[in-house]
Amino acid sequence: FKTYLNFWQQKITTFSRKLLIKYSAIALTLSLIIVACNSDSQLNQTSVSNSQSSSNIITIWWNKGYLIEEDESLRKIVQDWEKSSGKQVKLSFETEDELPQKTARSLSTGNLPDLLFSTRAEYELIPRLAWEGKLADLSNVIAPVKDLYSPAVLEAVYLYNQQEKQRSYYAVPIYQATIYIHYWQDLLAKVGKNVDDIPQDWDIFWEFWKKVQEELRSGAEPNSDIYSLGIPLSDKASDTYYFFEQVLEAYNAEIVDREGNLQLDKPEIQSRISQSLDWITTLYKQGYIPPDALEWLNTDNNSDMLNRKVVMTPNPTLSIPAAQRQDEEVYFNQLGTLEFPNKPNGEPMRYIVSVRQAIVFKESKNQEAAQEFLAYLVQPETLTEYLKAATGRYFPVMKPGWEDEFWHDESDRHIAIATKMLTERPTRPLYYTRNPAYTQVLEEHIWGKAINRILNDDLSPEKATQEAIARIEEIFEQWE
């Protein structure tokens, strides 16, 4: 009986093991199926970024907007185009500081987006990439709407390709801005002044602001900490060189001619550069610019202005009033926006225009589709709605865009004055459009360094001018 019992125990044990193995195999199979399904789901979610080369999905990297409404407006444009075209878009927003770094990394790895829009790329990246032959020719996007652009806007994107020894449209204009002057109307009122008292003669204009500071510091309610002029002077901020480029324009110091040639060997140009450096550094030495302006980054003059530490400041966008748009009392009644005065020789000021641009890389995997999207985006009605979402921080690059009454509302003096500056006054782009070597002049902050050499190292304006000229000539030689 014991032998019989052992026999059946062995059978049962063997059967149990087989059963366990069988069901374990089934369980394993089911687990693999579940994992595979989950993996397929995850793959579908990430295929936009991981399968660019095998799909028609367009990758767009776009500068994150100053306001959330800007980003939402672009998302809607993308969604509308996806519906009408049947194509898909992977849209990524990056900050102003991160996007250039991300782009630099992508250029080294070859993992490029199909379309890029970066506010800083205009003068730090695009002219160099066009020169190196790394951008797609976008003439087909420009051609149908070419007559709608102003000459200055077209000039900004008509760039030189050193590889092909010719110029072409290697970028598409999206919006433009120039440099404005913002001031506190209520601070002027404290010293019995208003906008009608501000003169248009160059020297008298700046003397006016000096007197405002002196009266605010010595009036019935003295403010010993206030400065009249929030002018950036550091060798780190793009606001510094943008403002100084406008000062050079005021003094008619043409650094690069229309053929792209340096003019720095001309004594009259050297003298005008020295005059410009002497003018701006004298304002600081006289105590009308905050001491820490030598260290300011791009946001610092905005902060000092909004905190009422300065009476007025130049700024290359309308971001200062835009930041106060929700406070109607501040926006409409306390903050003001001004044009620059006439040039020192009495001529009307010509404004330097910054044109923000979108590009398609030559090695982009979906070039044709990216250009189709750009052609959709630059339709005047589409682009205008996008710009209006930014509450007028930037302005149209096309003539039909200006016809929208949004830009001509006289009750909004910030936008109305900016519109006048960009549509009724002479304008020109930065010098990089004439010669891409000038991008390096801006990147190296040559003018900010010259200002700091005068103020920190007691160099004369003449010697600082010669140092700046020597470095600029070196840069241009390297680009030949």
Regions found by a protein language model. Give the residues of each.
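Extracytoplasmic/periplasmic solute-binding protein
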Residues: 160-174, 179, 204-263, 310
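Hinge/lid segment of periplasmic solute-binding proteins
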Residues: 120-180, 221-225, 240-243, 251, ...
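Short, solvent-exposed loop/beta-turn-alpha elements that line the ligand-binding surface or hinge
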Residues: 137-152, 198, 221, 231-235, ...
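Conserved N-terminal structural module of periplasmic/extracytoplasmic solute-binding proteins
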Residues: 1-8, 12, 16, 23-132, ...
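Short helix-initiation/N-cap motifs at beta->coil->alpha
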Residues: 93-102, 200-204, 292-306
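Conserved C-terminal helix/tail region of periplasmic/extracytoplasmic solute-binding proteins
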Residues: 52, 88-89, 189, 282, ...
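Glycine-centered hinge/linker elements that transmit conformational signals in sensory
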Residues: 208-213, 259-294, 336, 340
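C-terminal lobe and pocket-closing loops
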Residues: 318-331, 343-446
